[in-house]
Amino acid sequence: MQAITRRLVLGAALVASSFGVLAQNKVILGVAIPSADHGFTGGIVWWANEAKKELEKKYPDLKVIVKTAKDAGEQANQLQDLVTANKINALVIFPQESAALTKPVEQVHSKGVYVTVVDRGLTDDSGQDAYVAGDNTAFGRIPAEYIAKALGGKGDIVAMRGIATTLDNERMDAFTAVLKNYPDIHLLDAKYANWNRDDAFKTMQDYLTRFKHIDAVWAADDDMAVGVLKAIDQAKRTDIKLVFGGAGAKGMIKTLRDGTDPRIQANVSYSPKFIYDAIKMTAEARLKGEKLPPKSIVPSVLITKDNAKDFYFPDSPF
């Protein structure tokens, strides 16, 4: 991840503003992110505040204002406050929802604020200057390929979806595209569980009631995988041989590394640290009067027991 970050920051430094503007005297950078309502967003909040602390110490002409929101409505209101009360001239936003935040972000952008969107893309990208995200296509493709191979190309599976966002669509589209190559693998259902372990627990209970045989579960998130496993254990179902989460939460990676649950055989990387990278890249570019590349993607890779030690960070909040 450090090497990836260095490459992204170097790329940002090389992309000068097409308008040739001089460096700004003062950058007031607003950061709008979801509240820490599950493990991944907990990591997002932690890394955002780490960026604020480190960058404000390093750059006296930079002020970073971090706002967390419990839903799309609150986040939209915070954007108004950041513009009118805090007078921001740059924004890094991890949208609560894609569609609901597209217009509010466009309104901020129309006032001359430089906008970097992170992870959950907008439905219309004309209101942004840059986009930084993990590789959502690989995040969906890698689990599908692993599950298909593990099942020998045939079996019954169920899936979880997150929140209705562009990134969730990208992941699901990539997952189902792989399955088209395996006509004997049947995707029984794929419901939204909001990247939440309690919602995933309830969704999995529904699946277990409706489907008498399931070979594997694509939980699509490590928090949701925890809820899935709890539901399976409570139902005492032994038919499910594989539960594939995602994002590399330390608890799940430890289980994978130690081999303590045979259903946890693999994972896919997707670190919340990219919010730190996005804030750092945006702040440093704007202090120089420069722009970021229009799109920066952090690769996702397959994590197995063989390389799990490289993705296990015991001091991380996620």
Question: Each predicted region: which residue ranges?
Answer:
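N-terminal signal peptide c-region/cleavage motif recognized by signal peptidases
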Residues: 18-20
